């Protein structure tokens, strides 16, 4: 049974907790990267909204696939996609892990980009599944807000993983979505800025 209205606070708190862990305790997150990527996939699936004019059975299928704190008729919005995009961007940010003891004992700044690169494919695959869900939509404004975070994931994706994703993990519509995202990524990547 779903709540009467969507509780966006739950989404924001999940993202805030993950952001804090990524920013402050990278040493703990590195050992649980499959779990982190799975949670990010679940957050992407939570951004979906049912297509208009679905039948009762189809609507129930969509409602059952969403968390109980999301009312399908009042889906998550642009602010939540911005929040998730910030989390995705944070994954490539270099952070320090403070070792308890003297203040001189600091590790060098590192990001999760390298260890997470093995798991980026499944996050992008989840995004393409959300895009191509026949019973749901991902509105254009939400897709637009997710782009900076998705571009960070594309930056982490090595060529071998990208090719493997294209060949074996995606269907025809997923491949088209991947090509579209990659085209946009390439366009913004080589603008000469930064």
What function would you assign to each model-found segment?
Residues 147, 166-169:
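C-terminal/domain-terminus segments
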Residues 12, 69-73:
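Long, acidic/serine-threonine-rich intrinsically disordered regions with weak helical/coil propensity
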Residues 1-7, 18-21, 32-70, 108-135, ...:
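Amphipathic alpha-helical segments within extended alpha-helical solenoids and repeat-rich scaffolds
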Residues 10-22, 55-56, 80-105, 142-154:
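Amphipathic alpha-helical elements of HEAT/ARM-like alpha-solenoid repeat scaffolds that form extended
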């Amino acid at each position: 049974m779903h709540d009467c209205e969507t509780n966006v606070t739950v989404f924001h708190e999940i993202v805030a907790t993950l952001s804090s862990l990524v920013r402050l305790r990278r040493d703990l997150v590195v050992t649980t990267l499959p779990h982190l990527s799975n949670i990010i996939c679940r957050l992407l699936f939570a951004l979906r909204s049912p297509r208009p004019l679905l039948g009762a059975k189809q609507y129930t299928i969509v409602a059952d696939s969403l968390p109980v704190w999301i009312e399908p008729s009042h889906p998550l919005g642009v602010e939540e996609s911005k929040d998730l995009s910030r989390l995705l961007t944070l994954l490539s940010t270099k952070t320090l892990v403070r070792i308890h003891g003297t203040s001189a004992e600091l590790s060098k700044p590192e990001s999760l980009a390298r260890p997470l690169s093995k798991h980026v494919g499944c996050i992008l695959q989840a995004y393409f599944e959300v895009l191509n869900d026949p019973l749901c939509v991902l509105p254009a404004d939400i897709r637009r807000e997710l782009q900076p975070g998705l571009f960070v994931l594309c930056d982490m994706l090595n060529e071998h993983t990208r090719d493997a994703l294209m060949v074996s993990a995606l269907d025809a519509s997923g491949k088209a979505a991947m090509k579209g995202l990659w085209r946009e990524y390439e366009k913004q990547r080589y603008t000469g800025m930064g």
